[in-house]
Amino acid sequence: HRLIRRQRQMCIRDRKALVAPLSYAPSVISELKNGSAWYVPGGKSTSARIYADAGANYVFADDEHSGSVPLAFETVFDKGQNADFWLIKYNQAIDKTYKELEQDYAPYTGFRAFKERNIYGCNTGKVDFYEDSPFHPDRLLKDLIKIFHPTLLEGYELKYFTKLAE
């Protein structure tokens, strides 16, 4: 077990070193509105940390919470409307599309990531994200690096996330 853990830690260190010299760090928001609240990962959460490790600026990085933070749509929009990327997780039979996202909540279309088609989704009904990623953060980090910095990790195929289709 120690050997496996050490190998994963080395993979993570190597991936972080890959993005460390980059001068550009794209911004990212995550998740979706659920009822009256949009639950975002706190700035001290594992998600926030892995976004930073992947060379991105998480728009709520300055938040002091380590868990989910319920926010009003307007708060997320104010801070995240110009984010370069948007990562969502959902569970449904077919993959989510831009059309469906717009039908779910029309104000989503105001986000730059929506307009520029830079939304990536993880369909947890098809992908073992919650079962796999806690034990393989190196795999998740690799996905995020490929999303945020597409010229890196040439030939790598995303494991958890896919770019939303129209």
Predicted regions and their residues:
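Single conserved hydrophobic/aromatic residue that forms the stacking wall/gate
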Residues: 1-12
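Short secondary-structure boundary/capping segments
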Residues: 2, 20, 110-111
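Structured C-terminal subdomain patch of bacterial secreted/periplasmic proteins
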Residues: 6, 88-166
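Flexible, glycine-rich surface segments
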Residues: 13-98
